[in-house]
Amino acid sequence: LGNAVLFSIGQAMRKAGNKVLYFAGYKNMIDRYKVAEIEAAADVVVWCCDQAPGFKPNRPNDRSFVGNIVDAIHSYAIGNLGDPQIALKTADRLIAIGSDRMMAAVAQARHAKLKPFMKPHHFAIGSINSPMQCMMKEICAQCLQPHVDPQTGKTSYVFSCFNQDQPLDLVDFAGLNERLKQNSLQEKLTAQWIAHCKPALNAERPMV
């Protein structure tokens, strides 16, 4: 899902004259879609997949990696995927969209494993996937997301439905993970009901 959002952002950035280095991550090879749109959104795409053998790039400057996003970024930076066409140190902005654990890993790695390869004062944001309910902008507080200032330790709160794009260094990812777990039981029950009802629905309405 994150890739579907990012390719529209990438296209807008390229149109504005920016260079875009795009790490597209997937769990399974069958999960990839909108390939042409993603290629149009980036000067360089690194196709990442947990499942071997990974993707075969269509363009000469694109790369492929089997593993997670953080390891892919590191391998790209040190040249294990070939000479970097766009150096990480030239990046002024980093945008992460995906699971809370993936965004947390990227947020942390920027100050550890990836720090030698990043511009010191780059700005990183994540599209925070807090649980949401009313979608009426700051009404029900289901999407309330804690922020922790890394300098002062002060905690503040934002409504993610009002602004999903939040600075990675402020987001309390442990708090986000706990909030997402609140709906775990309902999500599992819903999945069971879908699996139970799907055969009957398919019999009534054959797939075309």
Report residues per predicted region:
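Alpha-helical hinge/cap motifs
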Residues: 1-2, 99
